[in-house]
């Protein structure tokens, strides 16, 4: 327990001589942008750790953080943390940067075992066979009565905090070796670790939201829902609660009898899931209206009415959290709000994007990869026909249609192009004849002809798909172009449904995972150039294959040049990477 100025000075002097130390912050909450420091712990040798309490008084707290600033900002020292992005953001609240190389034990484990849990209590158990003190033992279970770390004395906290720093350092020593053994060093040190400060910077930047626009959309949607409800009641000839699946089932299947045999759950209730209703859309006009009502309700609840509540009082912005250790494929995910799930297919979903706006006096800039997954497929399979189409700069869907239907590219109809597009995207996800027929609303015969024609056109893609499955069968995992592994234990399952799912992953995970690797590499390069060229504009959001920026008018040309250059040169393949971009006064316009 380091609770005097003398002890602090001694600890700092020690830290400054070390090449490696772990750090951990104890705070008043889980949201790093608003959290206040309660204490900091450090460890530079196994079984030895130090806890520095930080008082509630802001001036005093700032003084203590400043004392340790030389250690945090020492370029040469490796900083080790468990979810270190959180600690970086908290220290950032006190104007302190964590500089130099990083090692995040949570991300290291994610790179090794993407499907497992990565929290420290779990890692300590499996790697150190050690039971950590759980936070609940200090502050009580989640809920109303839960205490705050601030309410506890330093004496009550220091063992827990020191343990965190010590365990983190021990885990690093083990995981470092594991990364070596598993050939995951390049991915970890060149992509995932340099990405950590980039994500911290994006979360710190936050994004502005047009609350006025959301309010209007909310009123507009609510009015529409009320109208739809009236229409539905009229069509049903009775008033009922649209939000109740039970009542919807009774109206559709008992009263209106829109199908002979309706699916029921174990409890004898009718199934009225999205899927079921979608398949019944053509049977009665009431179905489409119920679906529309549900869609609006979800948008209102998840985004339109929820976004204003997520605005940070101090900054006036929303600071989404980017999660680097969640998806099995290597993509980023985000929470509070989840940006990856904003529906863009339909007009209503687009209303949400309209509410995301740039900083005052700035413009919104959006850049996204054009057909990156198909390009990766062309590269991985080495298919000469597809590579040629991309090199010629052809519209890939039209080129596919021309080849499959054996006509010249200028004769391709819109419908043929649309079918080829469905095939292009469906087939790389390992879609079946049945699945394709359903998605395109055609019979199975036509779907089968399309798939056969597709593989005739791109024979090496079929080879690649078969090879991927064989490889996964043999070694139990697949890899992306940067060597990210995805384990597929079900690939040899006796159950054909389970096995089929693993087989589709064997085909798609290398493609989706490589796309994730590439955009991460691009983000790191853009961030580094923004820093070295002193760009004041900001990268604010990442969604799938798209990056979004808030840009100062005088930096427009410079930013566009940097972003497109770095996105297109993030990785060199047999086909060029292409990025499209747009400008606007909000996300929707720019996209």
Say what each PLM segment does:
Residues 20, 27-60, 121, 366, ...:
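Metal-dependent catalytic core segments for phosphate chemistry
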Residues 92-102, 116-121, 383-387:
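A short alpha->loop->secondary-structure connector
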Residues 97-113, 127, 393-397:
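Conserved beta-strand -> loop -> alpha-helix junction used to position metal-binding or nucleic-acid-contacting
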Residues 241-243, 538-543:
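Short beta-strand
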Residues 457-459, 565-574:
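A common structural junction motif
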């Amino acid at each position: 327990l380091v609770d005097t100025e003398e002890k602090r000075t001694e600890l700092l002097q020690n830290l400054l001589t070390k090449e490696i130390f772990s750090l951990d912050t104890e705070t008043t909450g889980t949201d790093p942008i608003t959290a206040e420091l309660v204490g900091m712990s450090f460890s530079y040798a196994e079984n030895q750790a130090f806890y520095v309490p930080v008082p509630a008084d802001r001036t005093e707290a700032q003084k203590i953080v400043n004392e340790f600033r030389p250690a945090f900002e020492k370029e040469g020292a490796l900083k080790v943390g468990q979810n270190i992005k959180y600690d970086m953001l908290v220290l950032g609240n006190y104007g302190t940067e964590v500089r130099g190389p990083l090692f995040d034990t949570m991300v290291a484990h994610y790179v090794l075992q993407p499907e497992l849990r990565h929290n420290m209590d779990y890692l300590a158990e499996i790697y150190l066979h050690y039971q950590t003190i759980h936070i609940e033992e200090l502050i009580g279970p989640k809920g109303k009565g839960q205490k705050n770390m601030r309410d506890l004395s330093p004496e009550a906290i220091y063992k827990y905090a020191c343990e965190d720093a010590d365990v983190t350092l021990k885990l690093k020593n083990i995981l470092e070796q594991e990364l070596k053994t598993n050939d995951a060093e390049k991915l970890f040190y060149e992509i995932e670790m340099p990405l950590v400060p980039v994500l911290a910077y994006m979360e710190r930047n936050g994004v502005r939201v047009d609350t006025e626009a959301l309010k209007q959309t909310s009123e507009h949607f609510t009015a529409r829902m009320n109208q739809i409800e009236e229409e539905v009641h009229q069509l049903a000839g009775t008033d009922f609660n649209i939000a109740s699946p039970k009542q919807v089932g009774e109206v559709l299947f008992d009263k209106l009898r829109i199908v002979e045999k309706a699916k029921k759950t174990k409890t004898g209730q009718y199934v009225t899931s999205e899927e079921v209703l979608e398949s019944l859309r053509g049977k009665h006009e009431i179905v489409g209206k119920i679906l529309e009502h549900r869609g609006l309700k979800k948008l209102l609840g998840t985004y339109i009415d929820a976004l204003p509540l997520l605005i940070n009082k101090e900054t006036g912005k929303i600071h989404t959290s980017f999660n680097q250790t969640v998806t099995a494929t290597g993509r980023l995910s985000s929470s509070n709000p989840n940006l990856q799930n904003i529906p863009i297919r339909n007009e209503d979903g687009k209303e949400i994007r309209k509410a995301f706006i740039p900083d005052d006096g700035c413009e919104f800039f959006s850049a996204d990869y054009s057909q990156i997954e198909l390009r990766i497929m062309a590269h991985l399979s080495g298919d000469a026909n597809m590579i040629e189409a991309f090199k010629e700069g052809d519209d890939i869907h039209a080129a596919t249609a021309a080849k499959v239907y054996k006509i010249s590219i200028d004769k391709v109809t819109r419908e043929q192009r649309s079918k080829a597009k469905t095939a292009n995207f469906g087939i790389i996800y390992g879609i079946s004849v049945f699945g394709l027929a359903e998605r395109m609303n055609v019979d199975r015969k036509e779907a089968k002809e399309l798939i056969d024609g597709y593989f005739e056109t791109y024979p090496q893609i079929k080879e690649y798909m078969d090879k991927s499955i064989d490889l996964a069968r043999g070694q139990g995992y697949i890899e992306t172009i940067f060597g990210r592994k995805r384990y597929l234990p079900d690939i040899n399952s006796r159950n054909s449904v389970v096995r089929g799912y693993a087989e589709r992953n064997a085909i798609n995970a290398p493609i989706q995972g490589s796309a994730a690797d590439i955009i991460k590499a691009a983000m790191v390069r853009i961030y580094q150039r923004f820093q070295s060229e002193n760009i004041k504009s900001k990268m604010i959001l990442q969604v799938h294959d798209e990056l979004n920026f808030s840009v100062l008018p005088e930096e427009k040309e410079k930013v566009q040049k940097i972003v497109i250059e770095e996105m297109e040169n993030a990785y060199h393949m047999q086909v060029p990477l292409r990025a499209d971009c747009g400008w606007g006064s909000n996300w929707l316009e720019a996209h």
